Amino acid sequence: CAVLISMLLKEAEYDFYAVFSVQEEIGLRGAKAAAYTAAPDAAIVLEGTTAADIAGVEFSRRVCALGGGPAVSFMDRATVYDKAYYNAALKSGITCQPKAAVAGGNNSGAVHTSRGGVRTLAISVPCRYIHSPASVADKCDIENALRLAEYMLKGICSGEIE
């Protein structure tokens, strides 16, 4: 939410829809309705994701780590992300990390299959203790998620990222 609110507080070069959706955990209901109504040409889904970079968790089960920048997914349980967007994000020069697991999912699962299909990228802020009353995130990861979202929005809207 903080990344999207920060984007809305700035004057953007391009028009875009911002959606704060509900009921992601019980069927992506808000995202389904929003994607169908807005009928986007492209989508950048912003979210928090499980970092699991804590003591007692095997390294192979750590999806991403705090301080490594936002995580960018190539695939998850519900979505195969746009390859050009994924590669552009990783080559942007903005600190980010590939998400190391294809488990789980997010609102992209509803957005990318809406209507005739929507090219989609997910930018995920690594969080410890996600879905608890208090999650922990690295402020630099949030700032880099904002920078990456703005970079991708500009690149997609201008046609620089195809």
Regions found by a protein language model. Name each.
Residues 1-27, 148-152:
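Alpha-helical metal-binding/catalytic segments enriched in His/Glu/Asp
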Residues 6-12, 36-39, 112-117:
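Alpha-helix C-terminal capping segments
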Residues 19, 42-44, 121-123:
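Hydrophobic/aromatic beta-strand patches that form the interior of the parallel beta-sheet core
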Residues 20-27, 48-50, 127-129:
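Acidic, glycine-rich active-site loops and adjacent beta-strand->loop/helix elements
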Residues 29-32, 53-58, 109-110, 133-134:
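Short, well-ordered secondary-structure micro-motifs
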Residues 35-54:
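A glycine-rich helix N-cap at a beta->alpha junction
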Residues 40, 55-72:
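Active-site loop ensemble at the mouth of alpha/beta enzyme cores that anchors a bound cofactor
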Residues 65-146, 152-160:
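Active-site-adjacent substrate-binding region
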